[in-house]
Amino acid sequence: NGRCKGNVEKIREVSMLGAIIGDIVGSTREWHNIKTEDFEMVPTGSRFTDDTVMTLAVAEWLMTDSKHKPETLVACMQRLGRKYINAGYGSMFRKWLLSEHPQPYNSFGNGSAMRVSPIGLYANSLEEALELARISASVSHNHPEGIKGAQAIAGCVYLKSHAAWSTEHYKINQFVTETIGYNLDSQLEDIRNEYTFDVTCQGSVPIAIMAYLQRYNYPPEKALRLAISMGGDSDTIGCMTAAIAAAEKLNVIGSDFDDEVIKKCRALLPTDLLDINDRFEGFISKPLKQSYYLHGYLYAGEYPGDRKNEVAKRKIEHMVHFGIKHFVDLTVEGELKPYRHLLPKGVTYMRFPIP
């Protein structure tokens, strides 16, 4: 029956990937840690960092390569990374970005986890989220802990956007403790003063997840404030926490943050990065916006509509990925080109001529 469980909500005019909001809010606190949840969200000096650039590189990869090839991801990461080379990368990753033949370097830094959230929004199952997260991490952060950190965040984002509201926090906790193997027993308020800067996955990803879980029944800003208040690698912890907290049903992104916060964050992004953010939102929501939920089934609401078979085939693949398994044409005879031959197995097609 696909993803849709009701009428698709209208996308708000003001939106942004939660990971980017968290990155920007944490950007002024990375080297000037604060240990309080009472702070200005987007003060003067706030900026996007490498977390934002690489998050959008992953989003671009998902939009442009339906085969999800590692070499395509590398190309997306290097293109954006080189354009914004002073965004704040670690020394090893900077070398990787500039290398003519980049190779993974066995890193377990949190760079693999900070960029992965678009995968959780895109994936059609938890298994797909974990596999794509593995691919996305392995091109650079191929240490088992680097892969585990990416899978943890991708899985949490997927579950947050798919589980029922009453059980999402339980399912995320269960997934992280049983599948990933992180210990989530600490109360962050109790360890806040002793927590220090740690850029490893195992030292920062659980903190980010606990910040969400310990504020799950509040607006996402509360979870982000708790995450930033821990100190440490604030922009990346904020990026990961906000990515989870902002994930919503039906893939509407970032709409629970205050409009003014979102507007300030959007104003800090250059046009090309903002374009990727907005295109990705359309990419993950358009198939559902242009479909119909009827008697328990999801029907395509738009003819894939290109005379060129390859273009039509890509559109169909996009729709099917997001759970649309039934296609219906209501058409005057001769008006639309049939496309039954382009549909994969397991998909139904009905064509009703209009007199």
What role is predicted for each listed range?
Residues 1-284:
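Structured, active/binding-site neighborhoods that engage oxygen-rich ligands
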